[in-house]
């Protein structure tokens, strides 16, 4: 439309609002034989609007829904629990509410939210597909997320760091008290599951956990002391000859594989 602006009415200007900075977009608005540089008037302006929902905003949405549908709903409890899982990430907030409404028997309670989250973490959707694709496309981001989750490493929040900048732009990480943290519990769990699933098939510690699983529930309660005891036995048998550095770097990951 821009190239034909002299023969037909068109926009005076175009504003793009989205995830990518305009300086990272490759546009061709002229013939290939002409220069390809962006106009100096293309300005990537900051968009200082926090798109995340607060607990109060989630509560307001639930109140509106409750007024329209006359549900039995523990509004404040649901709003707080949804926020604890999502940190207000809009897609996740809406998705959890949709799952409660359609697949959890309209159980608008803390348990209903928990059930919806379990369904969400098991399903494929465009957001999680994009998460997986992005960490494949950006190995620096993947390495940082892996180190945070499994080695407990901390990274000072520095937007000049490429991995931090790209992770923030996609909404996968955020700044908290000057440090990089995973954006919300659902992303954290999904990433745990993704990284662990790549190791399950050939993991001896995982196979040991599978064999021990039936021993861990007693009278409907998880016997955590027995879990730790059994894990330490298997860990010593399998990895006892490794160095302290190996234990420090891999202990958390191996324990999660055992629990998986």
Regions found by a protein language model. Give the residues of each.
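A short helix-turn-beta junction within AAA+ P-loop NTPase domains corresponding to the substrate/partner-engaging
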Residues: 29-51
């Amino acid at each position: 439309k821009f190239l034909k602006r002299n023969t037909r009415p068109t926009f005076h200007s175009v504003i793009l609002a989205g995830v990518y900075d305009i300086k990272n977009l490759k546009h061709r608005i002229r013939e290939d034989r002409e220069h390809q540089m962006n106009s100096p008037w293309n300005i990537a302006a900051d968009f200082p609007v926090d798109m995340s929902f607060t607990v109060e905003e989630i509560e307001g949405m639930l109140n509106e829904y409750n007024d329209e549908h006359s549900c039995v709903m523990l509004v404040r409890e649901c709003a707080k629990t949804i926020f604890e899982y999502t940190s207000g990430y809009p897609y996740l907030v809406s998705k959890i509410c949709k799952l409660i409404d359609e697949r959890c028997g309209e159980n608008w309670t803390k348990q209903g939210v928990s059930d919806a989250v379990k369904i969400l973490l098991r399903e494929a959707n465009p957001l999680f597909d994009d998460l997986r694709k992005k960490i494949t496309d950006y190995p620096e981001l993947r390495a940082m997320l892996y180190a945070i989750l499994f080695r407990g490493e901390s990274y000072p929040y520095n937007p000049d760091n490429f991995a931090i900048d790209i992770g923030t732009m996609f909404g996968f990480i955020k700044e908290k008290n000057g440090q990089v943290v995973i954006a919300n519990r659902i992303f954290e769990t999904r990433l745990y599951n993704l990284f662990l699933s790549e190791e399950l098939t050939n993991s001896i510690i995982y196979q040991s956990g599978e064999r021990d699983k039936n021993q861990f529930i007693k009278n409907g309660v998880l016997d955590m002391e027995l879990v730790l005891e059994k894990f330490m036995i298997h860990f010593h048998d399998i990895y006892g000859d490794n160095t302290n550095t190996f234990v420090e770097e891999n202990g958390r990951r191996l324990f999660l594989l055992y629990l998986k």
